[in-house]
Swiss-Prot record:
Primary subcellular site in the record, as a coarse category: cytoplasm
GO molecular function, one term: nickel cation binding
Identification of the protein by name: Urease accessory protein UreD
Key words of the record: Chaperone, Cytoplasm, Nickel insertion
Family the entry assigns: Belongs to the UreD family.
Function: Required for maturation of urease via the functional incorporation of the urease nickel metallocenter.
InterPro entries membership: UreD
Signal peptide: none
Cellular localisation: Cytoplasm
Subunit comment: UreD, UreF and UreG form a complex that acts as a GTP-hydrolysis-dependent molecular chaperone, activating the urease apoprotein by helping to assemble the nickel containing metallocenter of UreC. The UreE protein probably delivers the nickel.
The keyword Cytoplasm appears for this protein: yes
Top-level division of the source organism's lineage: Archaea
Organism in which the protein naturally occurs: Cenarchaeum symbiosum (strain A)
Length: 285
């Protein structure tokens, strides 16, 4: 497979956006991007939270190739409120050398509210993908961050045929104190990912992290547990994060839409608790 050299235009993508409150709305106050990552202007489709900015991360490339290096930075300040999602799934194409890497820095300052709910990752056969996420969430802010990973292009007969998929999430507060950290590595050619101690026969897995003050986190966890137990085709559970300043939810299913139904429900529980507004669902542009 031929490829451009690492660092060439189109191989190194950058997206850096800052959101602040301006009057009654959250606006994109700073924006810098290098193809293929880019964003549209902020939209305001939610009648329940008319000042919340909805931001859609776009990529005309269709997926990540070997040697791709992506860097995303999203920062919320001055009591900003934003819902950030992607235009579609992150497709990780097959590789015969090298790997694809995506590093993300996401921060929410005091009084801010963020929902970061991207579409699923689809690792193609022989792909290698590394994702590193650093969260900086103020103790007086609230944020939802989710990840969903599928087994591959199932319709093409590819299921758990990728080489390696590694994810790392680390969250700190405004003082740099660790809130939680987690690393995961999947190598289906070396591991039995369908085993009872891993995915238990399921094929799609999702994780949701909710960062919120302890008194709100307990309420959100209770509601999230009920949502999981009442969603068909889902095996999952919740737990409080260290120090009680948030929750994590683990989700397993055979269907991606069932996972996202749970994620939206949990995001809705957080939004209702923190803002008093209902969650209308993810709206794609």
């Amino acid at each position: 497979m031929g490829q451009l050299g690492v660092g060439r235009t189109g191989k190194t993508a950058v997206l850096d956006i800052e959101l602040r409150r301006s009057g009654s709305r959250t606006i994109i106050s700073r924006q810098y991007s290098e193809v293929p990552l880019q964003v549209q202007r902020a939209l305001y489709p939610d009648a329940g939270l008319p000042g919340m900015a909805h931001v859609y991360v776009l990529s005309p490339s269709g997926g990540l190739l070997q040697g791709d290096r992506y860097k995303t930075s999203i920062s919320l300040k001055d009591k900003a409120a934003a819902h950030v999602t992607t235009q579609g799934a992150s497709r990780i194409y097959g590789m015969n050398s090298n790997c694809a890497i995506h590093k993300m820095d996401i921060s929410a300052g005091k009084g801010c509210y963020l929902e970061y709910i991207p579409d699923q990752v689809i690792p193609y056969a022989k792909s290698r993908y590394f994702q590193e996420v650093r969260l900086a969430i103020d103790d007086d802010a609230a944020a939802v961050y989710s990840e969903v990973v599928t087994p591959g292009r199932v319709a093409m007969g590819e299921s758990f045929l990728y080489d390696i998929l590694c994810t790392s999430v680390r969250c700190e507060n405004q003082d740099g104190s660790l809130r939680f950290a987690e690393n995961a590595r999947a190598e289906p050619r070396r591991m039995n990912l369908r085993g009872e101690a891993v995915l238990g026969g399921y094929s799609v897995h999702g994780t949701v992290y909710v960062m919120a003050p302890p008194e709100s986190a307990r309420t959100i966890e209770y509601t999230a547990g009920r949502i999981i137990s009442h969603t068909d085709g889902i095996l999952g559970g919740t737990s409080l994060l260290p120090g009680g300043a948030g929750i994590t939810a683990r989700l397993l299913s055979h269907r991606t839409d069932s996972i996202f139904k749970c994620i939206e429900g949990i995001a809705g529980a957080c939004r209702m608790e923190m803002t008093g507004a209902a969650y209308p669902g993810i709206r794609k542009c």
